[in-house]
């Protein structure tokens, strides 16, 4: 990134509509590398650093020269990008061509370019002289989207901007695909990746390190936001390597069914969803049922003497005594004394969603816009509510998050408990979350960090003095109390295989994290910085941000104010051009946020420049909607 741009800002105010200095510095780098040099870039910015806005600002710059195609994982994230595109446009302060920008979900892009599951090669010519931006790029490989991206790269010879806060999902294989997509050479994976008998023995070898450094030199942008404006994280439970884990000791009932399930799988259980199920809760005949829909149709089917299922509805005293789930027993007991909002991660949405819904209802927590809990717990005279988010939710997710994130819900009085499967691990932002729970162990530690990153990020908390509590729950045997302090104690299979599934999973993830961290440190070292005058294509964007910062602290100045002129000439060296720019923003009534007047416009009054507050007003029930296409980004759901 261009550190010369960062040096232009002093005590940057982040609390107003703004482009952060590192975002502008990165934008400069992207313009130079992708537009000027036609080279691909991996934007490896850690979660919460504002990758989306950087990408959209770049798309606006690039739209003046080329067509820009933006690919996002799903329809919900597409909505987020479309919303943020409006934010980026308002901050851009320069010309762009909106109809040159196309935003697609991966599924819609697939349907646009495939006929009967075969790539329509004749149609790929439309992508000549274009740029592709791929959000969550680590997720596109191993499927048709990844195949299509490779074909487009080879056929059209175009650059890619790949966004990822965690470019290695499970093994270095993902990084190998990223290298292949970004470089002009074909990668032989067998030469750069060494494979052992286990997944955790998949490593980037020395040749792979050299290939990485050679092919991606000058193509990596790494950034991690300083944590100075974040609340303290308080991890609960006993020490487990470099983190903390809450041991939830199973009852005899849960442990019995847990062991039956594990023996059925012959200990080959690391990725089997049934082990995720029974580690969360046991449900008798449901434990080994891969198609739950068949059992959901049963009438008054007994799972245990005090637990039955009827047409997909669980009922019985066991939902309160909770011998079926050591994790939920801990959770239900703990939340009774906690204040604030909760975010709870779980996997296997069908099984997990069933368990969660009826345990919560039976223990006095009401479903948001749904069933009321038994003897409901109250807050401010209203029932404490929960919602369950899964991939099946599409149209309602955005509205649900609006309620959860609203200032009126900071205390959880509107919606207190948000349960979510993997759909919430990427791209979404949660606000004022005080308790984060893991009901199941994530597949990777990058996913674990992504889930934390949905909540613990800059601008998500009004009061950062209050800590955020994290509970990583592990179901363990009734007599299991091992202290896990070193990976070196668990190098032999016979020692690992007898461990509870959750503990084994955590160790497995930690082994993989060693390789991930090694590669991340290489990428971090490859990220280049330089100090140059800003690229001509972003000068107006940069000046707009400098002006916003200046007039936040200045409500009224002389028209020939030396500080304002000095600030503008730090970018536009010619004083006459700088004065002309000042004339333009005053006569054009540039929009600023002032600490006294809030939303304001710049005006000339006699020999002064003043900030004039404004408010939009309209007649009741009278709205004007502008449908001119030059104001609308072309998009497809």
Curated annotation (Swiss-Prot):
Gene3D superfamilies: P-loop containing nucleotide triphosphate hydrolases (3.40.50.300)
Domain Helicase ATP-binding: 32-185
Domain Helicase C-terminal: 327-507
Gene Ontology CC: one annotated term: virion component
Protein purpose: Acts with RNA polymerase to initiate transcription from early gene promoters. Is recruited by the RPO-associated protein of 94 kDa RAP94/OPG109 to form the early transcription complex, which also contains the core RNA polymerase. ETF heterodimer binds to early gene promoters.
Record InterPro entries: DNA/RNA_helicase_DEAH_CS (IPR002464), Helicase/UvrB_N (IPR006935), Helicase_ATP-bd (IPR014001), Helicase_C-like (IPR001650), P-loop_NTPase (IPR027417)
Keywords for the protein's UniProt record, in alphabetical order: Activator, ATP-binding, DNA-binding, Helicase, Hydrolase, Late protein, Nucleotide-binding, Transcription, Transcription regulation, Virion
Binding, ATP: 45-52
Enzyme class: hydrolase
Intervals of motif DEXH box: 135-138
Similarity-based family: Belongs to the helicase family. VETF subfamily.
UniProt-listed CDD domains: SF2_C
SUPFAM superfamilies: P-loop containing nucleoside triphosphate hydrolases
Protein name, entry field: Early transcription factor 70 kDa subunit
Organism: Vaccinia virus (strain Ankara) (VACV)
PROSITE patterns recorded: DEAH_ATP_HELICASE (PS00690), HELICASE_ATP_BIND_1 (PS51192), HELICASE_CTER (PS51194)
């Amino acid at each position: 990134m261009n550190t010369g741009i960062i040096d232009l800002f002093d005590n940057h105010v982040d609390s107003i509509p703004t482009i952060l200095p590192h975002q502008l510095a990165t934008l400069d780098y992207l313009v130079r590398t992708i537009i000027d040099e036609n080279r691909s870039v991996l934007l490896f910015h850690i979660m919460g650093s504002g990758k989306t806005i950087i990408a959209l600002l770049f798309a606006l710059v690039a739209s003046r020269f080329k067509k820009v195609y933006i690919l996002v994982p799903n329809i919900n994230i597409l909505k987020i990008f479309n919303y943020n595109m409006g934010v980026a446009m308002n901050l851009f302060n320069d010309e762009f061509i909106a109809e040159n920008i196309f935003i697609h979900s991966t599924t819609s892009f697939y349907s646009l370019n495939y006929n009967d599951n075969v790539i329509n090669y004749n149609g790929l010519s439309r992508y000549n002289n274009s740029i592709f931006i791929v959000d969550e790029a680590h997720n596109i490989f191993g499927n048709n989207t990844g195949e299509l991206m490779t074909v487009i790269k080879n056929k059209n010879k175009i650059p890619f901007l790949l966004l990822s806060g965690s470019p290695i999902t499970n093994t270095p294989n993902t990084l190998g695909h990223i290298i292949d997509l970004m470089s002009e050479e074909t990668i032989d994976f067998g030469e750069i990746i060494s494979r052992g008998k286990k997944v955790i023995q998949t490593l980037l070898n020395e040749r792979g390190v050299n290939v990485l450094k050679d092919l991606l030199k000058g193509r990596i942008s790494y950034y991690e936001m300083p944590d100075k404006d974040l609340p303290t994280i308080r991890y609960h439970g006993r020490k487990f390597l470099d983190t903390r884990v809450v041991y939830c000791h199973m009852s005899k009932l849960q442990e019995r069914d847990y062991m039956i399930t594990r023996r059925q799988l012959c200990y080959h259980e690391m990725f089997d969803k049934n082990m995720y199920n029974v580690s969360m809760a046991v449900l008798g005949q449901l434990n080994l049922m891969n198609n739950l829909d068949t059992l959901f149709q049963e009438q008054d089917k007994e799972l245990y003497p005090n637990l039955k299922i009827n047409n997909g509805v669980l009922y019985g005293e066991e939902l309160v005594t909770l011998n079926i789930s050591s994790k939920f027993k801990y959770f239900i007991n703990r939340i009774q004394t906690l204040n604030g909002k909760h975010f709870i991660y779980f996997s296997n949405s069908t099984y997990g969603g069933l368990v969660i819904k009826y345990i919560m209802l039976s223990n006095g927590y009401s479903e948001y816009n749904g069933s009321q809990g038994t003897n409901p717990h109250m807050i401010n005279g209203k029932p404490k509510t929960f919602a369950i988010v899964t991939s099946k939710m599409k149209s309602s997710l955005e509205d649900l998050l609006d309620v959860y994130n609203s200032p009126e819900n900071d205390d959880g009085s509107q919606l207190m408990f948000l349960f979510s499967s993997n759909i919430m691990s990427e791209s979404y932002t949660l606000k004022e979350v005080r308790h984060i729970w893991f009901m199941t162990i994530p597949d990777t530690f990058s996913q674990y960090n992504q889930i934390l990153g949905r909540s613990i990020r800059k601008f998500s908390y009004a009061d950062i003095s209050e800590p955020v509590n994290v509970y990583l729950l592990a179901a363990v045997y009734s007599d299991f109390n091992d202290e896990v302090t070193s990976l070196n104690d668990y190098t032999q299979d016979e020692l690992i295989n007898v461990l509870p599934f959750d503990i084994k999973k955590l160790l497995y993830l930690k082994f993989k994290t060693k390789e991930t961290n090694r590669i991340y440190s290489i990428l971090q070292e490859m990220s280049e910085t330089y100090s140059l005058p800003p690229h001509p294509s972003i000068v107006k964007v940069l000046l707009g941000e400098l002006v916003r910062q200046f007039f936040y602290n200045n409500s009224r100045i002389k028209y020939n104010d030396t500080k304002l002129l000095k600030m503008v000439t730090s970018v536009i060296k010619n004083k006459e051009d700088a004065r002309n720019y000042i004339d333009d923003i005053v006569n054009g009534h540039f929009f600023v946020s002032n600490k006294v007047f809030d939303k304001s416009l710049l005006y000339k009054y006699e020999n002064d420049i003043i900030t004039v507050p404004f408010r939009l007003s309209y007649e009741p029930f009278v709205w004007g909607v502008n449908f001119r296409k030059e104001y609308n980004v072309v998009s497809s759901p």
